[in-house]
């Protein structure tokens, strides 16, 4: 397991040319690390949380690399719960790499998902919310985005906690009925406890079913176009995608290998396959 006391860093934006690129650092001492390479060192070191500071970023040898905007987040008021600083620079891959290489002299590159792992370990989110972060990033349709966002906001966590509270309360009532059965005390109604147990089981089953719905939202509903050769499977495939993805000719047997594409239908992710004709 990674050492959570280490400073970690990673680009937050995709590789390639863009207007802006962002590099995030997290961990005790990350603000001081960046300050050593920043034109307004004292201003940065004394900066409060949730503050923006503009200035120049310098290499280890003191050579200016780029003008940057720093976003400061003091613990525990950050994504990871630790001190966090984000460097916004111009989105030239060469500039990003030079800044990153300078930083990496004093810290290490974050592993995939490590910022979210630290947020989980520091109590900034629970496991359900941590999973929702990845679901929201990977969502390919509107409904998948909405479901992931609700989970990230803690809707599933609150639902699970309420269910757990009901189970705990029912367990206490059962234990009370068992431990004091031989004493002349008012005990919980057994029929009421049984009905509560049945209702809890029903609720748990409903929750389990939503898991299957969530899987379909994440992975997409799979649709396979099959049929005899030259009946229009590839034409339908292209029409659904609204692009000429498959070759269409009057001659049968044009499609030899299956084609796979993702699309959104009414906000739901769909994985559609175009296949060779059945003979």
Locate each region found by the language model:
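Conserved G1/Walker A P-loop phosphate-binding module
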Residues: 17-25, 37-39, 173-279
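Detector for Asparagine
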Residues: 3, 51, 92-97, 101, ...
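Residue-identity detector for threonine
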Residues: 13, 61, 80, 102, ...
